[in-house]
Structure formats: C-alpha cells, structure tokens
C-alpha cells in the first residue's frame, strides 16, 4: 500500500470570481485531504491559479488592464474565498511563479529530445489591423451549429466545440474587423507515438477501479477514436515562451502548461518535491477535476510525463465530478443570476452550512441543481434536525442531570456492533472518494443515536435507574465524539467546536473511533446551528435570480413554451450538397409535404457520409427564423441527441416508424386531443429553452413524451437513449 497521498484540485482560471459550481473540486479535494490526515497518511494538498492563456489576455483587454494586474487581483479574490470556506491547502500557488517557466520548458525540451515534438503549418485567422494572429477567444462570430453568437473555441449556447475558422461572419474582438486566413507554424506533441506507453500505463494503474465511470468512458472513447498530434503553441504574448529557435514569439498553449503547474507549485514549498512527484512506488496521486477536464488529466498530462522518460508519479485515483447548476438557470455575474463565492460571504450563513450542502449533493454521477428551497430543507432537517439535535440533546441532558465528568465506558457489543460496521463503511466510502455516500452514512449513524435516545426515554429513567441511564448517555457521548471525527472533513469548524465542548481532549484521528479513550469532561455546550428562516431564503432567492424580465424569460414553463411556440415536423432528405465555402456544412434539400420543400444547412460532415442520410426521414424545427450560413439560406434546424461523452446522433424516424409521412407534426402527448395552431417564427434561443431530452430512449419535455400527431407513436432515440436534444 502506498504511504503518501498527493492531492490536487483543478487549477481555477484566475479571470473570474468562482461560483458555487466552481467550488466543487477544491471542496472535494479538501474533504479527501482531511480524511487522509485523519487516517495518519502523509498528505500534501496542492492547488493554485491557472494564469496564462487567451482567457486571461482577453479579460485584461476588456477590463483595460494588464494580464499581470488582472491575475494579481483575481488571485487575491480566489484566495480570500477559499480561506473563508476553510479549505486547508498545503499550498495555494500560481502558474506565474518563478519555477513554473523553468519546469514547463524543461519538460518540453525532454519531449523534444525524445522525439515527441513535431512542427506543422496550419491556417489561422490573422488581423491585418492589429497585425497579429488571433487565438480562438480573439475571434467571435456565429456558431455554424445553432447560429448564436460564439467565441472561437466553443459555443456557450449549444456547447459545440469549435475552431475559429468554423465561425460564420468572424470578427476580431479587438478592432471588430474581419480577419483573413493566413498560414502559421506551430509545435505539436506526437500523441500517437506515445499511445502504446499510455495504454500500458492505464492497464497497470488499474484505472477501471481507480477512476469513476465517466472518466473511463470519456478516455476510452478518445483513445478508440484515435490519438492525433496536438498543437502545444499559440500566437500570444501572455504565456510561457517557447525555448526553440524560430518560435521565440510564441508561447505554450495553456492546456500544456497548466497541468505542469501542479509540479511547479509544489516546488515552491518543498525542496523535497521529488519525493512527491518522482516517487511512483510510495506516492498515490489523487486528482479532483470537473468532467470538462478529464482528458487533460487522463491522457495529456500522463503523456507529457511518459514522454519525458523520467520516473514521474503517475495518476492513481481520479475523481471527476459533474456540474452543479443554479435553479435551472446559468450562473451569470453580469445578470445577477446565481450565487458566487464573494456573495456567499455576505449571506450571514456560515461556511460549514454551505460546505455541508455542497457535499450532501456533490454531483458525482449526474449534474445537480442548486435550489434555495431544497437548501433550506436539507440544512434544517439533516444538519440541524438530525446531527446538531443529537449533539445538543445528549450533552445538555447529561450535563444537567449527571454533571460534567465523563466516565470511561465498557465497550459493549449490543450498542457498538452495528455502529462499528457503519464506521467501516463510512471510511471505505471516503477511501473510494464517494464523499456524498460517506456523509450520508455519517448522518445515518446520527439517526441511530437519535433513535436510541428517543426509544430509551432517559428523561423517564434518570431517577428510577440512574446507573443504567448514565451508561446509555455515556455511550451516546462517545458516539458524538466519533461523529465529530468522521464529519470533520466536511464541516471542520463544527467538528472543532464539538472538540472544544470536551476540552480538546482528543485529536481528529481514526484511532479514537469505537474506543473509550479521550474524554474526561464536558466543559460547556451550546447550540451548533440555528434553523434557516424562510424569509431569509426567499430574500436571497430573489436577490440572486437576476432582473425580473430575465427571470421570467429564463423560467418560462417548457411545456407551455413547446405547445405554443414550437413546431417540429418529419421531413425526408432528398439531396445533400457540401457548402463550397465550408466543407463541414451540408446543404440538405427536404420534402416537408409542401410543393416547394425546404432547405436547411447543418454541420454534419464530421459525423455522417452523405449516402447514410439521403432518403432518411428526420425531424426539424419547422418554424425557426431563417438564417444564412456562409451565404446559404437555412429554413430550419434538424434535431439530434448528444450524450455526456459528446457522442452525437441525428434522430432517424425510420428507427421507430414504418413509412413516415413528410410534413407530419410532432406534438406533446398531453396535447393529443387539442387543436393546435401553427406558431410564428422563433429564434434558436427560444427553441432551446424547451429543454427536450432523451430519457430511456424516449424524447420528452419536462417528463411528457413527444409523439407523432396522427399515429400517436412515441418519438424515440434508439442510438443515444439518454442525453440532451437540440
């Protein structure tokens, strides 16, 4: 068994204020680090800010400051928020530290020496006005997939990953002029050459038991599709300079330098850093990330280390989490939607309450919506009504009727057998980084304690059988001590407070669990928490919901919206041509049951060959406002399903319906007896707010099935049974 835990949380970008969803990784890693220390494992928890790259450079332009000044300001903001949340880093550093440049350049030179670096020419936007190549976020335009405004790396509206040259009507963000396409030269890491070593490492690291399901699926899909050489340089000023002739004016891509930041930040506090990072036999590297960062930690960072041919500590356990969202809305600081780290501090609600709720709902296997009403309910019922109630009622009752002194108890099986089994279960959940399950197991133990107190009715027996009643209460007091230890990774301030009740006579250590050690007196007691009041929660909900118009717009009932505003129809694909100005765009001529038919433009070339689609019946948004894509008119949008691993499939009607009829409308099952009007034209934004999903192979809006208007057959998604539909 490895003796040391080296724990990292994904380095947050330092160009914004973190919201609740951004805090999941640092909080998760903090809980695991505290558990690790509790188990007397040598532990180092490393994190810091990711400061280089386009996001920082463009944010500095917008705020009319320098990247250095921007990073200094946001680093201080991040640090203060994490301190308020009581996150116990061993170091919270920065990728602009002195050792980072040397560490990144040194690894690059080793990769080059070992033959893993190539160079290639590529086409990139160049701004003639500003005389510079434009990295992805320096370009804005229309998304070729949904027509919305998008940056050159990804469309925030439909989540489509993009390259800048995919954008329609591209513009430079600095001068707003139209850039030209120009050839530039970049360095690449040769991932195909490292593939065999990468796969061998994955097999020996037992990733199937040490990584969660989403990480395994995402990584295996990436490897199955074939590794490609990946650019590691960019035409920017704010970054680590490339130590190679002819590339002096370029910097390393932030995805290349950021993971190396874990190493360089460790160097800042430990001369003995190699005992952590070059000690694969004794050190277990545990990394906490969001699902959007999986491949950088399972493929890219390991490939960099393997390619250097040095004895690096490799990834052991990977804990990737899903997204924490806000009241079915998008977090937006400018619109006042959602609660951000600096807002949390001003609510008057303690850090441990926030920590408890985030762990209780940690998005381990699926996304989670933060809801104010649920927040109040869980805190009042679980943290206060269950855990805090046990601590308060037992200690105050004992102190009142039996005094301050705590006697040593005899550990009896009838009281402790079930509880000790639950201790083992809790510690195993911690070990497997199933933090939500660990917390809920602790709350189950607390419930057992409350039930024992209630069932035994010590208020009735204290006079008739005082010795037996005292023994019962003493067992419950030792149970409370154990709960304060087990729950300390989640709510450390509260755990310390309980320890102070007992004069801090024991440590946060697993060696005390289930024993009669470490308790002498109850020095004082007080209520741990007060209940959250509805008036406070309602005021916070209103405060962080955005302006009224925006709130009404974003929370419009999806069912009413679909019934009144959306018209989906079955169409047959008659012909497909490629757009001469954009090879990825198909021009589809459709039979929609009308004499003239329809034409739509869709970016399907990466997913389908023309012959696979011609003659098939698909579903389109029939009443979408017309748009032009690279000069070609589009009169609608086909709908497709995408799963969490970005697998994408067009919904083919033949998969579930014989002899489809072009022009037949798709409606909600609840509207099957209604006479529906044809709605007016709508924007893509309005359509996406209907939130159509595939659930167990069936298309639904808010749980209601979509069906064919005449045959009443359900609309199915055979190839991707669960995912979002757009």
Curated annotation (Swiss-Prot):
Top EC category: ligase
NCBIfam families, per the entry: metG (TIGR00398), metG_C_term (TIGR00399), PRK00133.1 (NF001100)
Entry GO CC: aminoacyl-tRNA synthetase multienzyme complex; cytosol
CC cofactor: Zn(2+)
Gene from which the chain derives: metG
Keyword Heme: no
Family listed: Belongs to the class-I aminoacyl-tRNA synthetase family. MetG type 1 subfamily.
Keywords linked to the UniProt accession: Aminoacyl-tRNA synthetase, ATP-binding, Cytoplasm, Ligase, Metal-binding, Nucleotide-binding, Protein biosynthesis, RNA-binding, tRNA-binding, Zinc
Binding, ATP: 333
GO-annotated biological processes: methionyl-tRNA aminoacylation
Cofactor note: Binds 1 zinc ion per subunit.
Source organism of the structure: Borrelia turicatae (strain 91E135)
Pfam families: Anticodon_3, tRNA-synt_1g, tRNA_bind
Iron in keyword set: no
InterPro entries per the UniProt record, alphabetical: aa-tRNA-synth_I_CS (IPR001412), Anticodon_Met (IPR041872), Met-tRNA-synth_bsu_C (IPR004495), Met-tRNA_ligase_1 (IPR023458), Met-tRNA_synth (IPR014758), Methionyl/Leucyl_tRNA_Synth (IPR015413), MetRS_core (IPR033911), MetRS_Zn (IPR029038)
UniProt motif 'KMSKS' region: location: 330-334
GO MF annotation list: ATP binding; metal ion binding; methionine-tRNA ligase activity; tRNA binding
Binding residues for Zn(2+): 143, 146, 155, 158
Taxonomic superkingdom: Bacteria
Enzyme Commission number, as recorded: 6.1.1.10
Function: Is required not only for elongation of protein synthesis but also for the initiation of all mRNA translation through initiator tRNA(fMet) aminoacylation.
Domain tRNA-binding, chain residue ranges per copy: 562-667
Protein name: Methionine--tRNA ligase
Compartment(s): Cytoplasm
Known partners and oligomeric status: Homodimer.
Catalytic reaction(s) noted: tRNA(Met) + L-methionine + ATP = L-methionyl-tRNA(Met) + AMP + diphosphate
